[in-house]
Amino acid sequence: MFRMAVLIAAAWAATILCVCVAVAADTATRPVNPYSGNAQLAQEGGSLFNQYCSHCHGQWAEQGERPRDLRRLRIRYGDDAISMFYTTVSTGRMEKGMPVWKGVLSDETLWKIFTFLETVQTED
């Protein structure tokens, strides 16, 4: 009986350790926006957004279609919004009409656009 209790406790400890390592790894691999909170660069990002993205996502990201409404990134993806943005913009989603922008736009430009998008997130 004691041996079974020890095995169960060890299994729980291993499970908790795996979850903690997975959460830490996920957080460690999440990209970091170097311009987050910079109002001037957010304004530049808005202009860049209107130049490169607005034909599908609307001027100033005001697109009513939910799949393309980038004001809802935080609602849809929570803490993973930054990863979803960077991955989608970098690698595209050709099946949904999203082109690959990596190599076309610099990382600096992508982060300025994301900095702008951080300022227009909606709560509903």
Segments from the language model and where they lie:
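Axial heme c-ligation environment in periplasmic c-type cytochrome domains
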Residues: 35, 64-72, 91-124
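A generic structured-segment signal
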Residues: 40, 53-54, 85-89, 96-102
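Electrostatic cytochrome c docking/interface patches
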Residues: 22-48, 124
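Processing junctions and N-termini across compartments
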Residues: 18, 47-50, 92
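Gly/Gly-Pro-rich "capping" loops immediately C-terminal to redox-active cysteine motifs
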Residues: 35-46, 61-90
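Bacterial N-terminal signal peptides
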Residues: 9-19
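Positively charged n-region of N-terminal signal peptides that target proteins for export
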Residues: 1-5
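The canonical Cys-X-X-Cys-His
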Residues: 45, 49-59, 98, 113-117
